[in-house]
Amino acid sequence: MKTNSLSAWILAIRPYSLGNSVILILIGSALAFTDGGFRPVVALLCLVFAVTMQCTANLVNDLCDFLKGADRPDRLGPDRAFAKGYITLRAMKSGIAAFTLAACAAGAGLLALSGWNWWLLLVGASCIVFAYFYTAGPWPLAYHGMGDIAVILFFGLIPVGFTYYLQCGGWSGETAV
């Protein structure tokens, strides 16, 4: 595979994992629709935010697992683009930054459409922080038994709950089920 090629990036963002983000936004939007609050533009921005955050998390994971020695070029399972040398360090860091900025742009749109509820900025920022610190930083959550909790929150409750909230303007217990 050619270094930094489109096929290398497709491998790195792990498209097979993106269905999780899509499904969670669809669930939150379906609940909003059922309750009469569906807002297509908000749903689309939630989808962009969720998918770009998933891509960010996948790229950070690809990079940091290799740097920490968890992934090697000869690992069992799907190839990891950085471990295989398909993406350079500089390109990987740029890709992480680009997907993070795309998520921030979608988040800014959601913030504006929410009427500038600034506490939502904290939620968006926490999504970014946890996407990084799942496998990055001095105390990666995935390596200290906290990965499952982070996944339940940031790839479960938060996407469904906030997709609903941003469309309906309130909470529903159904989003936690």
Each model region followed by its residue ranges:
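Alpha-helical transmembrane segments of integral membrane proteins
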Residues: S7, Y16, N20, V41-L45, ...
